[in-house]
Amino acid sequence: MLEFDDIQHLVLTRVPAITGRYEFLSFRQPSQGRAWLAGIIDKVASAQAVRDGVDSERRWVSVAFTWPGLRALGVDEASLATFPEEFRQGMAARSQVLGDTGVNHPDRWIGGLARPDLHAIAILFARNAQERQRVTGEHAAYLARTPGVDVLSTLDLDAIPPFDYAQIGRVHV
């Protein structure tokens, strides 16, 4: 049986977000990455929380990690070895298999997303532009108080009419 309160909402639900931002992060030291995670984990919405409060919530936070990001957090080698080879290789190394060639080659990815020091993505979704500004501002203030976590790049997202939700899919890193 699935424990919906232990699964991030992004895996199982779609929120009524019409805007958002992906913030691509790098950790200088394991302790700094863990400190960032410890401070944001309570803001990450579970699938159960979204099911219970989707109508009243205005914004949603998720996090995703790359395999190098898990290593950068200090996850032990035995645990890292349990992940599928495809995840360990990463998207840039698998670009041929994924069809990311030519103009879509990792060397052309905007924001340096093929960099080996891409460790995590903070996924900040909001119901409207005002809430996006609020959630991104809060995360920026949090990052300013959390040394050793660098923003490599960001990607702002907005709904495309006539849809009433942002075309924000799952993040695969």
Model-derived regions, located:
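Calmodulin-binding IQ motif helices
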Residues: V173
